[in-house]
Every structure is written in C-alpha cells, then in structure tokens.
Amino acid sequence: MSSGFKRPSPRTWRPKEEEELIELIVEACPTEGPRVKAGDDDAAVLPDGTVVNFDAMTRSRHVPKELRDRDLGWKFVASVVSDVGAMGGEPSFFGFSVCLDDEVDVEQLVLGISEGLREFGVSLIGGDVVEGEELVLSGTCLGKLKGEPLLMSNARPGDVVAVTGPLGGPNAFVRAILNGMEPEETLYERFARPRPPVEVGVELARGGYRAAVTDISDGLLAEAEAIARRSGVAIEIHTWKVPVDEGVEEVAQEFDVDPVDLALEGGEDYEFLICGPEDVVKEFGLTTIGRVTEGEGVRIVRNPRARSE
C-alpha cells in the first residue's frame, strides 16, 4: 500500500503520524485535476487513465546488509511497480534517481534494476545519479488503466476478503537475521525478489470487476485497516485461512509465536489484498481469508466458532 505520497518507514512512524503527515502535505499543496488524487489511494490516476506511483528506499531504513545489491535493484523496481498494478494499471515506464554511497556495487545494482524492468515489461525513461553518504533510491512508475481504478474504497458488506498468495516470509526473514539466525534461502528469496501479481490487478480493471485492492507492503493487518477505513466497512480476517510462506513456521517456533502473526504484522510481501464479490475469487484463483461486514475496523478471528453472525 502506498499513496500519491509514500508513507514513511513503519519502523520509525506510527500509522496515525503517517496519516497526519500525508494530510499535512496534501492540504498544503494544490492537488486539483487527477481522477484519483495524491494521498487518496495506492497511486494517483490522471484524467487520461495514466497511473503514477512513487517510492523510495534508503540503506539505513530498508536495506539489511544481507541483501545483495543485485537483489536490491530487483526489489526496488518491484516495490514501485506493485502499486500501479494494485490500482489496475499496466506498468509501462519507469524513471529513477539514485544517490550512490561507497558501499554499493553499482554494476550489480543496475543489473538487478534491469532484470526487474524486464520481468515486469517496463521501459526506462530517465533519471538522475548523484553521490552521497547514504544509498538512496527513488523511483517513479507510469502505467495505463483500461477500466475503472481498483480503489480501496470499493469494498462492500458481503464481499469476500482474499489474497493472491502466501504471506509472512519477508517478516520471518527480517526477524531471523536481526536475531542472529540463518533463515532458509526460500525466505531470502521472498524478501529479496518479490513478484507482485500485477497481471491480476490489470485483468480486474480490464474486466470491469468491482474490487478494493491494495498491495501488502505494510503488513496484512495494516492494509486491511486501510481498506476498512476508506470503504466505511468492517473486515474479518480468519487466521486459519491465511496462507503462510514456506519456512515461516520454523522461525515462528524459534520465537514462540504463531506463524500467522508473522503474516498479519509483517510487510513487504507484495501480494495483493482484494475485497470483492465471490466471483472475483473464483475467476482469479484467490485464497479467501475473511469477509467484509457492516461496521468499522478489523476483527481478527482465531476460532471458527467465533465468527460474527
């Protein structure tokens, strides 16, 4: 999840502070014109259907030393492209600026960026390069929307809540390395080489489906709360239905936590969270993890018998 303005790192900002900062910026600046304005959703949508997204990474906040430069390049592209797909846009063009530090292997970083662009069918249109004390990557992706945007305000009571794939791997990887563990290579791959299901968003919009969609970059719980708030509904998440990445259970056992909690509270999964009619789940092979009801907020249901009637 993002917006026309990206939220600061969740490691240093609480959700309320993030929302207040975005509101401050949006209220202070002119925002007239777009169909979907800055701060309203995952990305901005211009009158002609162009979808625009911005994202940034810094070494100190987003890049653990275990992340290889080539994989950093890929991850950077994926993180920028993901929000365009979540809005229903087909990513087309990419520009980026980079502040290079003394640690980065520039050739490997560029190789990873190139691989990411080719993977998602995106062409480079320009950028800027400077040198500095810290590695900073800032990217912009433009895509084309064929249909209506997949707004986070589209959820309705009676909808199913679904995800495009398993979760928790990136969170388990980070927790493991911060505590001196050597996680499985599969967890590294999930953290370093995310593959957001852009084609799902594109086909949802092209097919005229009504769905609320966001990418899971800040964690399943946080993204569900964002959809519930923007749609004016309540969301139930049934934990026994949440798919968990391979290797998460081993890390969870080490820290005596429920593997599902690593999926709920993690981030950087870059799968899509989708709320929509039952036919959306069937058509796109999604995994149902809950339902949308009347009310507000998010309810975590851990016992099947505790479901709201």
Curated annotation (Swiss-Prot):
GO molecular function annotations of the record: ATP binding; magnesium ion binding; thiamine-phosphate kinase activity
This protein's UniProt keywords: ATP-binding, Kinase, Magnesium, Metal-binding, Nucleotide-binding, Thiamine biosynthesis, Transferase
Uppermost EC category: transferase
UniProt-listed Enzyme Commission number(s): 2.7.4.16
Entry keyword annotation includes Nucleotide-binding: yes
Superkingdom of source: Archaea
Ligand binding (Mg(2+) 3): D41, D83, D215
Binding site for Mg(2+) 2: D55, D83
Pathway: Cofactor biosynthesis; thiamine diphosphate biosynthesis; thiamine diphosphate from thiamine phosphate: step 1/1
Reactions the enzyme catalyzes: thiamine phosphate + ATP = thiamine diphosphate + ADP
Any coiled-coil regions, as ranges: none
Annotated residues for binding of substrate: H62, E268
Residue sites binding ATP per the record: G127, D128, S217
Record: residues binding Mg(2+) 4: D41, D83
Any one GO biological process: thiamine biosynthetic process
Positions annotated to bind Mg(2+) 1: D55, D128
Other notes: Reaction mechanism of ThiL seems to utilize a direct, inline transfer of the gamma-phosphate of ATP to TMP rather than a phosphorylated enzyme intermediate.
Entry function: Catalyzes the ATP-dependent phosphorylation of thiamine-monophosphate (TMP) to form thiamine-pyrophosphate (TPP), the active form of vitamin B1.
PANTHER family to which the protein is assigned, alphabetical: THIAMINE-MONOPHOSPHATE KINASE (PTHR30270:SF0)
Stated family: Belongs to the thiamine-monophosphate kinase family.
Protein name: Thiamine-monophosphate kinase
Native species: Methanopyrus kandleri (strain AV19 / DSM 6324 / JCM 9639 / NBRC 100938)
